[in-house]
Each structure stands twice: as structure tokens, then as C-alpha cells.
Amino acid sequence: APDPSSFYPYVHCLACRGILGGYACGAPGEPCNLNHDPYFRPGALITRGQIAKIVSNSAGLSDDPGPTQMYEDVNSFNPFCVWINRLTHRGYMGGYTCGIAADEPCVPPANMPYFRPGSNATRGQLSKIVANAAGLIDPHTDQTFTDVPRESPFYVWIENLASRGYIGGYACGGVNPQTGSSEACDGQNRAWFRGANNVTRAQAAKIDANTFFPNCNPSVR
């Protein structure tokens, strides 16, 4: 991430701690410089497996969850298995019931759920995982975002992060770039959270760093 990037402090904060890394130079469009520095790909979407690794490491979870397989699609050969199991064991992360999606059949006798480690993570999912791992589960009654009412399944976690300045939204009156839907202003001109939108690597780094390492950003309360 270049210095002018608004995400630089967060990416740098996590990279210096060995929590996240990049991609070796030399791929198409990513030439090597004299130092052969890697590329971070800040605009690339982040997956559920990658999120599990970053959040688990940021929370300092280092226990061995054991050999038990918790998801049909995450066996011991999966590169994210340890981190996924650490979060799942604590109830910070979950999966999808087998048999609902056509390509996720139930396999007897365990009929385990599916994790979908390669699927893109959403802003709502990331908020839940980060807030849970950080122990931010205080009850709330206020509504910060137009599209996150108290009935939202992610309401508690989003409000816990938003109330501390760890996560923000988008000013009303615009258009959601991923869905194309308009985001009208309500009577209080509240921002929109866009909880179903996919998260980029840079956005995930910012939310994670704000929550677990707030000293990386002096503006965070």
C-alpha cells in the first residue's frame, strides 16, 4: 500500500505484526521493483478464510483446536483450518447448514455444515466476527445506520463497533456501488452501512486494526 493511501496506517500496522501479508511480485500487472517488494492488493475482495486468519491472529488466539473437523469443506489440509476452528470453537464464527445449497449436500453420518472459506466476506459478517473476538457485545438500543435496524441479525455487533468509532458508513443520498440501489436520506440523515456488501482487503485491515490496535490510528476514540 503506497504512503498516500488512506488505508496505509492500518495495513502497515497489521503487516508489521505479522498478521497479514501480501503477494509475491511478478504476477501480470505487478512487476518487481529493486527490492522485490510484495503487493498487498488493497482493492481485492477478502474471503471468509482470510478473515478467519486475520481476526484469530489479531485476537491472539494461539490454542490448538484439535483434529476434529467442524465443516464439510474445511479439513485439516485447508490452509485456514486452524484459524477457522479456533473462532468456531469459541462461537465467534459459524457456517451454513448442509443440504440448502445445491452443491453442499449433507454427508452422513455427521451432516456437517459448510464454511465456504473461499466465499467473499460481507461487511456484516466481518463486524460480527471482529466484535465477538474482541469481546464487544454490549447491548445497544440506538440506531446508527438507516439500513441496520434493531431487527438486523448483525445489529449488536455493528453498533458496538460504530459506537467506538471502529467502523463507519456511507453518507445518505448516494448509490450503493455493488447493488446499484439508491440510498435515500431518512428524517435523521443517517448513514448507510451496506452490510451485505463484500469487503476489500484494505477495508478489512482498517476495521481489524481499529478494533484490536486502536493506537495505530490516533483519531479512534
Label every model-predicted segment.
Residues V11, A52, S127:
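Generic structural marker for isolated residues within well-ordered, non-membrane alpha-helices
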Residues G18, G91, G165:
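Phosphate/pyrophosphate-binding loop motifs in nucleotide- or prenyl diphosphate-using proteins
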Residues A1-S6, G21-G49, N57-W83, M93-G124, ...:
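Feature responds to low-complexity, polar/acidic, surface-exposed segments characteristic
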Residues I167-G168, I207:
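C-terminal functional regions that serve as terminal interaction/effector modules
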Residues P9-R17:
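Short, compositionally biased
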